[in-house]
Amino acid sequence: MRVAAALERGVAFDRRRYVRHAVAIGGGLSANIRPATPIVVVDLSAGGCGIEIGIHVDVDTLVWLKLPGLESWPCRVAWSRDGRAGLTFDHPLHPAVVERFVAAGG
């Protein structure tokens, strides 16, 4: 029974649509009309990212991610705990944009 549960969990974790890349990109995150909060993107894919933010953000909140050289990008908070959060992009980033950040070392 434990093996079946582990296999099911493994399948669930493998369902991501986009490959995530470890990065370290300084940026900002804003919601509503508040000024941007400084963040560090720690992983990036075309469909979303993981960030270090230092504060709690409510799940399913519409936020705007600002990265160097890009316009603010609309996202939703997928999860938030211990000063970190996962964001899902409303529209995927072009793969060339992701590769640019990865090639630059994040």
Tell what function each PLM region has:
Residues 49-53, 83-92:
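Short, solvent-exposed secondary-structure boundary/capping segments
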Residues 13-16, 47-52:
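Short alpha-helix capping/helix-loop boundary micro-motifs
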Residues 35, 69-71, 83:
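Short acidic/polar mixed-charge low-complexity motifs
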Residues 45, 80-81:
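Structural motif
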Residues 38-40, 74-78:
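Short beta-strand-centered aromatic/proline hotspots
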Residues 25-31, 59-69:
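Short conserved beta-strand and strand-loop elements enriched in small hydrophobics
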Residues 1-42, 95-106:
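N-terminal helix initiation/capping motif
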